[in-house]
Amino acid sequence: AGAVVGYFAHKYKENPPVMVVCEASAADCLYRSAVQADGNLVNVTGDLQTIMAGLACGEGNTIGWDILKNHVTVFASCPDWMSAKATRIYANPLENDPHIISGESGSVPLGLAYTALHDEDAKDLKEALKLDENSNILVISTEGDTDPVRYREIVWDGLYGTTESLSKDFFYNNMIL
């Protein structure tokens, strides 16, 4: 995340895009670090159980954190259902959109964008992301279906369906001064 954010922050110095870091809520160290707002990293310990196994680290990279804390607009702590929903969206495209096989860790940015656009409880997030009908959204998935059995359970069987409400504080707008 630090390398991608650093690239876009450097390339578009005068008008940087809105940049978001999505984490599994069970291991949301960067989100917690941003909320703490003292510039230091917070480690998450204990049960880091999540379907987003690639994001279940609980510890941020100190070099990357320096870039992220200064350039990321929103840090999001995302529930598993948000990732699962996006995995299904990628697998079942509309009209001429391509079919994409994305694992759970790679799907969560699309899940956050979809939630911001379609969930009334996420209207503050939509505002923080400056999303409207003219927005262009780039989501980056860095993972295929690393667990084919789990992927099929999510896509075919509806594992981790949307059954929870969003927590009021599931995202942090890092750019509020």
Name each model feature, range by range.
Residues 59-129:
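Active-site-adjacent helical/loop segments in soluble small-molecule enzymes
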Residues 174:
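Short acidic/glycine-rich loops and adjacent helix/strand connectors
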Residues 1-70, 120, 125-171:
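Glycine-rich phosphate/pyrophosphate-binding loop at beta-loop-alpha junctions
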